[in-house]
Amino acid sequence: MDPNCSCPTGGSCSCAGSCTCKACRCTSCKKSCCSCCPAGCARCAQGCICKGASDKCSCCA
């Protein structure tokens, strides 16, 4: 898999634990910061899932 986890929205990918996943929007990747999180979000962590609009994020809501 691409180390940058560039995958389509709603798709699935297998990110490595060291992957930053900044461009990943797939539903299966929950290893790192969501692309929808604002810059400097202190709560970007595992389990973060983007929902809908770019400002709707489960870890930064």
Swiss-Prot record:
Post-translational modification N-acetylmethionine, affected residues: M1
Role, per record: Metallothioneins have a high content of cysteine residues that bind various heavy metals; these proteins are transcriptionally regulated by both heavy metals and glucocorticoids.
Residues given in the record as a divalent metal cation 6 binding sites: C37, C41, C44, C60
Sequence positions that bind a divalent metal cation 1: C5, C7, C21, C24
Sites where the protein binds a divalent metal cation 4: C33, C34, C44, C48
Quaternary context: Monomer.
Domain remark from Swiss-Prot or TrEMBL: Class I metallothioneins contain 2 metal-binding domains: four divalent ions are chelated within cluster A of the alpha domain and are coordinated via cysteinyl thiolate bridges to 11 cysteine ligands. Cluster B, the corresponding region within the beta domain, can ligate three divalent ions to 9 cysteines.
Protein name: Metallothionein-1A
